[in-house]
């Protein structure tokens, strides 16, 4: 049997060598059919039975530049990696020997819809205890998993853990959220960290794994998941974990580095410019991209490229080959290209999502309410909540809105309305302009409560795992079709049933048709809003903060411009019904928004619509719109506006009426508005801060 040597690693053709069990290599590279039959990707599948391994040998030493220090002694020079070309044929005797060991070496190159993860008759783990005495997972980790009450493997864990432990080229794993994905990469990275601790005699010897995620909230959730297992490990074998995320003080100490680091891209890129910080990453073994499709969607690819270059530059010559693991709910041509650049041109690929598996989990019951207009939509939603609170005391709901200002408005408005109409439910809110401590507190309180409502932006659409969410509600079309699936995925988790409810108006119906055509989304029940008991007038007697309302609708106009372009919706109709909602909220039938709010829409609007709903001026009825910037392609904010919700602190309760503003007992004005970031056309969301 021919052997190709990769540095210190040994790769037998078709068989990765472990100390006890031989496993087949997973499918090499990514098949075209997994990219929605895209013609952009023409690379044929690799026939691993032919035994061909191709690579170029290239080694280049790079210098660390820009620090003003000689870092050769500190971190060594860089080995960009070498590979050796070999061509070999498996003999018949070797094939027979493999069959005796019950190893499936068959890879059907024509079967591009399903790539088998592993096929071993004598090892099909269903519980973590099945790994005992295999030499794959250290007993100290298995005991810690048991103490943390992780006993049974989920389907993704059954398919993926062993290949992730054995891969030499790195791996792309397609997996849905809520399927046990975090534990899937936790185990191989923890195994590597424990081995490093043993080898170093319990001393800190640098970072072993870095996990890169799109949001602070997801980073903290993964951190908590690791801590559950680490609590069961003691003594010199126990690895340490820290985070490097925007908006919070680092828990990472480069002078005594933890073995595992969880990071958001912007903060990691910035900190790697520090020689001291970078020196802790010279012997990194694992790099994990979690929610990789979202990392690319929100515009982090240039940042990830920069991080990749930095890591390659600072790794020492004698470091083991870097293993990169990428997890994503969707895998398309763009992500495949990213994986080839960051992982390996012939990366291992495993698909844990069955070909005929619906985009939305079968445990999620999808319901649509067709509303007459935006006023009817918000009124019906409030009455829907009122009825649920009466009928289901343990109701736990997440409400998704498109902008941070929309979250602030609905949070304050619903809090007052619930108080006014004796609707007994706790309300929390979460978005990127709140401080990290406020966000963490809101999420923790929502998780802890048996019932409640969390109003949030897309920041919580991916990765955030809250047990017991019974309902997910969406009041606007998602900016991207894929986001719908991720939002509804917050319910129906861990085998429990959930309900996803979409409130939609006639001008937005093209969005529903796109959901069906692109994602196969069908609604089991479609109701008219009149079927809801609308006994409470949501708007009667309410006195909202006009500044908050102006901020909401100012940024909403830019969002409407974006979705009208994406889904080919009539901008005139969207503006008419939403400005009518604005008037109903303020109870001013002739109220108009500033013409500046329509700047992203102006070319699509009829002149009569512009005259009816907008006026020349500095900010609608009350000069609002400072503070958030919101959606759109321009900087909408101005200095002197309201920024009362972005800060840290205020002494009011997190539950009702908690404005969490900067300074004072009532969370008053901070005195400085913030301009908006560029809109979606620039690649990143205008709510970029939600993602770091």
From Swiss-Prot:
EC number from the UniProt entry: 3.6.4.13
Annotated InterPro entries: DEAD/DEAH_box_helicase_dom, Helicase_ATP-bd, Helicase_C-like, P-loop_NTPase
Chief localisation class: mitochondrion
Top-rank taxon: Eukaryota
Disulfide bonds, paired cysteine numbers: none
A biological process term (GO) from this entry: RNA splicing
Motif placement: DEAD box: 290-293
Domain Helicase C-terminal per the UniProt entry, residue ranges: 384-534
Subcellular location: Mitochondrion matrix
SUPFAM superfamilies per the UniProt record, alphabetical: P-loop containing nucleoside triphosphate hydrolases
Catalytic activity: ATP + H2O = ADP + phosphate + H(+)
TM ranges: none
Molecular function terms from GO: ATP binding; ATP hydrolysis activity; RNA binding; RNA helicase activity
Biased composition (Gly residues): 661-670
One Gene Ontology term, aspect cellular component: mitochondrial matrix
Domain Helicase ATP-binding stretches: 162-349
Biased composition (Basic and acidic residues): 89-99
Region (Disordered): 82-113, 643-692
Annotated positions binding ATP: 175-182
Location of the transit peptide in the chain: 1-37
UniProt motif Q motif: location: 130-158
Function: ATP-dependent RNA helicase required for mitochondrial splicing of group I and II introns. Also required for efficient mitochondrial translation.
Protein name: ATP-dependent RNA helicase MSS116, mitochondrial
Gene, per the UniProt record: MSS116
């Amino acid at each position: 049997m021919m052997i190709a040597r990769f540095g210190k690693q040994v790769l037998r053709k078709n068989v990765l060598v472990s100390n006890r069990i031989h496993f087949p290599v997973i499918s090499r590279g990514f098949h075209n059919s997994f990219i929605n039959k895209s013609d952009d990707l023409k690379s044929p599948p690799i026939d691993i039975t032919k035994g061909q391994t191709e690579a170029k040998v290239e080694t280049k030493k790079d210098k660390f530049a820009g620090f003003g220090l000689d870092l050769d002694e500190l971190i060594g020079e860089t080995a960009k990696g070498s590979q050796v070309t070999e061509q070999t044929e498996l003999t018949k005797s070797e094939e027979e020997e493999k069959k005796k060991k019950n190893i499936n070496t068959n890879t059907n190159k024509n079967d591009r819809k399903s790539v088998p993860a592993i096929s071993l008759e004598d090892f099909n783990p269903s519980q973590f205890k099945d790994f005992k005495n295999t030499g794959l997972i250290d007993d100290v980790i298995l005991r810690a998993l048991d103490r943390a009450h992780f006993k049974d493997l989920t389907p993704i864990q059954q398919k993926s853990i062993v290949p992730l432990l054995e891969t030499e080229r790195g791996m792309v794993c397609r997996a849905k959220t809520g399927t046990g994905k975090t534990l899937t990469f936790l185990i191989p990275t923890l195994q590597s960290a424990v081995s490093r601790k043993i080898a170093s005699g319990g001393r800190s010897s640098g970072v072993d794994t870095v996990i890169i995620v799109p949001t602070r909230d997801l980073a903290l959730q993964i951190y908590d998941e690791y801590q559950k297992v680490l609590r069961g490990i003691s003594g010199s074998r126990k690895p340490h974990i820290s985070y490097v995320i925007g908006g919070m003080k680092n828990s990472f100490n480069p002078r005594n580095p933890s073995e595992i680091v969880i990071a958001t891209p912007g903060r990691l890129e910035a900190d790697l410019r520090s020689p001291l910080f970078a020196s802790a990453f010279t012997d990194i073994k694992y790099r994990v991209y979690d929610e990789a499709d979202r990392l690319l969607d929100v515009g982090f690819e240039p940042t990830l490229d920069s991080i990749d270059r930095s890591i390659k530059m600072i790794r020492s010559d004698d470091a083991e080959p870097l293993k990169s693991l990428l997890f994503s709910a969707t895998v398309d041509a763009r992500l495949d290209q990213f994986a080839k650049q960051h992982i390996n041109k012939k990366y291992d690929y495993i698909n844990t999502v069955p070909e005929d598996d619906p985009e939305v989990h079968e445990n999620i019951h999808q319901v649509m309410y067709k509303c007459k207009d935006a006023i009817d939509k918000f009124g019906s939603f409030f009455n829907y909540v009122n009825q649920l609170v009466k009928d289901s005391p343990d109701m736990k709901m997440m409400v998704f809105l498109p902008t941070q200002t929309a979250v602030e408005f609905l949070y304050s408005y619903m809090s007052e309305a619930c108080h006014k109409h004796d609707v007994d439910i706790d309300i929390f809110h979460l978005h990127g302009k709140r401080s990290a401590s406020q966000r963490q507190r809101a999420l923790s309180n929502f998780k802890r409560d048996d019932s409640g409502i969390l109003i949030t932006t897309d920041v919580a659409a991916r990765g955030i795992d809250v047990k017991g969410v019974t309902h997910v509600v969406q009041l606007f079309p998602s900016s991207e079709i894929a986001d719908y699936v991720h939002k509804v995925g917050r319910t129906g988790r861990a085998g429990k049933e959930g309900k996803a409810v979409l409130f939609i108006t006639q001008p937005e119906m093209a969005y529903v048709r796109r959901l069906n055509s692109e994602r196969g989304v069908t609604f089991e029940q479609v109701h008219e809003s009149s079927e809801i008991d609308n006994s409470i007038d949501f708007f009667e007697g309410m006195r909202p903060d006009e500044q908050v309302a102006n901020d909401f609708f100012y940024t909403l106009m830019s969002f409407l411009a974006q979705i009208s372009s994406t889904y080919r919706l009539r901008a005139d109709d969207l503006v008419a019904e939403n400005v009518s909602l604005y008037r109903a909220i303020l109870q001013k039938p002739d109220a108009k928004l500033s013409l500046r709010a329509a700047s992203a829409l102006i070319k699509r609007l009829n002149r009569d619509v512009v005259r009816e709903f907008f006026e020349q001026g500095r900010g609608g009825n009350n000069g609002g719109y400072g503070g958030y910037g919101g959606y759109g392609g321009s900087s909408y904010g101005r200095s002197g506006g309201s920024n009362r919700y972005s800060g840290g602190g205020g002494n009011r309760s997190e539950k009702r009426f908690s404005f969490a503003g900067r300074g004072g007992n009532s969370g008053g004005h901070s005195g400085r508005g913030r301009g908006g970031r560029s809109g979606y056309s620039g690649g990143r969301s205008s709510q970029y801060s939600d993602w770091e």
